[in-house]
Amino acid sequence: MIPAIENAAFTPPNAAASVIKPYVMSHGTLEVYNLKASRRFYEEFLGFECVRHAIPAMVIRCGLKFHIVWVEGGDQLKPVNLLNHWGVDVGSRAEVDRCWKSANEQKEKYGIRKVLPIADQHGVYSFYLVDLDHNWWEVQSYEGFQHDDMFDFGDRFSMDEGAVSAEVSGIKAGEK
C-alpha cells in the first residue's frame, strides 16, 4: 500500500533557534558519468521524473518537495559507499520482490553493477543495488510512512552510545 502524504507543509521544530531558518530540505546532489545513459536508468528503471535544467546537470524527483541534482562528472566521478545510498519506497513486500527480480534480469540493459539479496533489516524489507554511476539505491517496503514515523518516534538512542554495531562496521567495510 502506498501511504497518503497528509500534510506536505512543515515547520521545523527548532527553526526559531537555528542560525539558518529552513522551510524545506530541498535537494541533494549525486554524480553521474553520462547524463544520457543515466537519464534512461532513472526514468525507465526507477520511474523518476527527469528534467535537464543545465548543460552539465539534470534534476530528478519522485514525490515530496525534494529533488536530486545530478552532475556529469565523467572520469572525475568518485564511487560512494553503500551507507551513502538513496532510498526508494514501494507499496509492498511483493513489489520489492518484483523489483529485485527485474533488477537482476535487467542488469545489463541499465548498467546495474550489483544487486544485493533482499533482507528484513532496520524495520524495512529491502534490497540495495549499485547503478551505472556507482550510486547505491535501497528499494524498500515499510508498513506505514517511514519519513513521518522516524520523526514521530523521536530519539530512540542516546547520543552518548559510542559503540558501533558489527552490522554497521560490516556495511562500512563493504561486507554486506
Each predicted region: which residue ranges?
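Short, flexible, glycine/charge-rich loop motifs used to bind or transfer phosphoryl groups or to couple energy/partner
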Residues: S18-V19, D75-L77, P117
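Vicinal oxygen chelate
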Residues: V32-K36, G87-W136, G144, V164-K176
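N-terminal beta-strand motif that seeds the catalytic metal site of vicinal oxygen chelate
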Residues: I2-K36, W86, F145-K176
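Conserved short beta-strand elements that form part of the metal-binding/catalytic scaffold
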Residues: I2-N14, E49-N84, V90, W136-S141
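Short glycine-enriched loop/turn motifs at secondary-structure junctions
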Residues: K21-V24, P79-L83, D120-Q121
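A short, polar/proline- and glycine-enriched secondary-structure boundary/capping micro-motif
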Residues: P79-N81, K109, D148-F151
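Core segments of cupin and vicinal oxygen chelate
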Residues: V19-Y23, T29-E72
